Regions:
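Short alpha-helix plus adjacent loop in nuclease-associated cores
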Residues: 101-111
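Short linear capping/connector segments at secondary-structure termini
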Residues: 97-102, 132-134
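Active-site-proximal alpha-helix that buttresses catalytic centers in soluble enzyme cores
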Residues: 1-92, 96, 105, 116-124
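Acidic, glycine-rich loop-and-strand cores that form catalytic or ligand-binding grooves
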Residues: 111-134
Length: 134
């Protein structure tokens, strides 16, 4: 979303004005914006690539992750879910770690929702979450 808004408003206007707001008349980018349609498409590409790998003979495909971690931002969790749903076993634990966030800044897009909202966001997903470092 930030590259889109940088392009739409210009970097200086983004930093001076728009980054402090939750959105405009068209888009919401804070706090903790959802994954954009482009992000969903990219995550689906990751999923499809892994699915292709796993259809190869076992000795050719890479091993599945043994530890799954994510930042606490909803867009990160959505990327993880789209990428790995149906590949990792149902109920796989996702370790949510605060320090995995790309930025802990003052811009609204860098702020995250509450633990309750994160749990609600993940409620219908096939993964269990374990939140660390709050």
């Amino acid at each position: 979303m930030m590259s889109f808004t940088d392009h739409q408003y210009g970097k200086q206007a983004w930093e001076d004005v728009w980054a402090k707001k939750n959105g405009d008349d068209t888009y919401e980018w804070g706090p903790d914006p959802l994954l954009t349609p482009l992000g969903m498409k990219q995550a689906q590409h990751v999923h499809d690539t892994w699915t292709s790998f796993l259809q190869m003979p076992t000795y050719l495909h890479p091993p599945l992750p043994e530890l799954v971690c994510s930042s606490p931002l909803r867009r990160s969790l959505s990327t993880l879910c789209i990428s790995w749903q149906g590949i990792l076993p149902h109920g796989t634990k996702v370790h949510i770690r605060e320090h995995l966030r790309e930025v802990m800044g003052k811009n609204t897009c860098d702020q995250r929702v509450t633990r309750t909202d994160l749990e609600r966001h993940m409620q219908l997903r096939p993964f269990r979450i374990a939140i660390h470092g709050e």
